[in-house]
A protein has these predicted regions:
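Helix-to-loop junction immediately C-terminal to a conserved catalytic motif
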Residues: 6
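Catalytic Walker B motif of ABC-type/P-loop ATPase nucleotide-binding domains
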Residues: 111-114
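Conserved ABC transporter NBD signature motif
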Residues: 14-29
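Conserved ABC ATPase "signature" region
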Residues: 53, 57, 65-82
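Conserved ABC ATPase signature
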Residues: 86-90
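H-loop/switch region of ABC-family ATPase nucleotide-binding domains
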Residues: 146-148
Length: 189
């Protein structure tokens, strides 16, 4: 589903529209969707800062605005001390934070995070939660987060959807817990 929403997978039936534009007719670079995939890819010959600046430039974000936003993201995610590192020099958790930063810099209407908390320690998870909440308030976009970390989802989401066997079900965020989800999955409730 995430690949379809982000236009990576065009092999589906039905129609996905954003602002009345059919997404299967939109060029990938013109998609109003940013996607932090579960398998990140970076330009290892560039620094972290340069990777973020390149993405901002490709999305036509004004230079000073990009500089300011990169600083906020680096500070918020605890990446400031790594800004001159190559992505190849980073730990898995730090690469995951960079992957999330790459999606957040894009300023799209929809930002998709696929397992954004994977590989993060509890401190890094809390940093990411705070940045997601802050950016969501400021940017006013839609954030779609796919995660198995129920506690983190409760901390950042105002709606939770459960996708199971091709069916989507909305669950009240305050009521989301492992037992309820396990019951829904096992009984097909």
């Amino acid at each position: 589903l995430l690949n379809i929403l982000s236009n990576y997978d065009k092999n589906y039936t039905g129609v996905i529209s954003i602002d009345r534009k059919k997404m299967n007719k939109v060029d990938y670079l013109d998609m109003p969707v940013a996607y932090a995939m579960d398998q990140p890819s970076f330009f290892n010959e560039l620094t972290i800062y340069e990777n973020l600046l390149l993405i901002a430039s490709s999305r036509k974000i004004k230079k000073q605005e990009a500089f300011d936003k990169i600083e906020r993201i680096l500070d918020g995610l605890g990446l400031k001390k790594y800004e001159n590192y190559s992505p190849s020099e980073l730990s898995k958790g730090t690469m995951q934070r960079l992957n999330n930063a790459c999606a957040m810099i894009q300023e799209e209407k929809i930002t998709i995070f696929d397992e954004p908390f994977s590989g993060l320690d509890p401190v890094q998870m809390k940093l990411l939660e705070n940045v997601i909440v802050e950016f969501h308030k400021k940017e006013k976009g839609i954030y779609i987060i796919s995660s198995h970390d129920i506690e983190c989802l409760q901390n950042v989401c105002d709606k939770c959807l459960l996708l199971h066997n091709g069916q989507i079900r909305e669950i009240n965020t305050e009521e989301v817990d492992r037992e309820k989800i396990a019951k829904i999955l096992s009984e097909g409730e």
